[in-house]
Amino acid sequence: MELVNPGYGSGFTFKLTKWKNIKRGYTHFADGDIAFAKITPCFQNRKSVIFKNLPSGIGAGTTELKVLRPYYRQMSHEYILAFLQSPYFIDEATFKGTANQQRIVSGYVENKLFPLPPIEEQQRITKRLEEISKMI
């Protein structure tokens, strides 16, 4: 989880390793996938990412990542990421588990209402969010 940057944005770093070492016991993802932390406090710290430019096009990470793979072409990856980092998504989550190992409840993402405007509006929103974040 330490390789995914907290806060708004989509920064991450990676380590190269042999696939046989990470084939099992890890969450797998590919270029274009969007992932977010499902464990506290990383979830509240908005640890989320759009995976881009992975050396082999695929990767593996902690099992504490929830990976989303948008198939619908009319969905902006940046818009989805902004939604995942929004107070609406973060603040309304409920958790389950022990005090030190709480995770978002199963089905939270699948049952969350997702506002989906036309692609042009998604792009306008994410462009404006980028402009505002540069001012902060």
Regions found by a protein language model. Give the residues of each.
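Amphipathic alpha-helical coiled-coil/heptad-repeat segments
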Residues: D91, N111-I136
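A structural micro-motif recognizing beta-strand termini
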Residues: N53-L54, R69-Y71
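Short amphipathic alpha-helical coupling segments at ligand-binding clamshell hinges
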Residues: S76-F83, E121, R128
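DNA target-recognition patches
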Residues: M1-I22
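Short Ser/Thr-interspersed hydrophobic loop/turn segments at strand-loop and sheet-helix junctions
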Residues: L3-G9, Y26-S48, A60-L65, Y72, ...
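Catalytic cores of nucleotide-enabled group-transfer and carboxylate-activating enzymes in metabolic
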Residues: R46, P70, Q74, F83, ...
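A short glycine-rich beta-alpha junction/loop motif
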Residues: I58-K66, T98-P117
